[in-house]
Amino acid sequence: MRLFSQDTKVQALKSVPLFEGLSRKELVQLERICEDLRVEPGKVLCREGQIGHEFFVLVDGKVQVARKGRRVATLTGGDFVGEIALIMEMPRTATVTAETPLRFFVLTRREFHAVLDQNPKVERKVLRALARRLAETSSDPTLA
């Protein structure tokens, strides 16, 4: 069931730093493989320590982000969780639980990689954005 318009999803994807260099046409390619979902309060979207396979973009509602059982953040519509899961298999660093009725969409690693395999230009742009993010967040200036 389609919960969101194409434009809503494209605008949300555009705000994700990993996708900042993508054109509207390329964002539409990603939008087409996203699944629209709705869950009730208490539903766990991802659990700390488990390998992540999905990236979540929140549209309406609120989630709690917890590490080692302690709340570290609250996220709402427009926020996103799990972009690293699109790139590599790593354990989740936090548990994310719906606090209110939640509407969101999901992009899986498998579908994302299929788009990258079919479109090397998108892959290059995503890798550039990832490298830029790593450079910005690196606290060691000798890693340049």
Language-model region placement:
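Cytosolic regulatory regions built on CNB/CRP/Popeye-like sensor folds
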Residues: 1-144
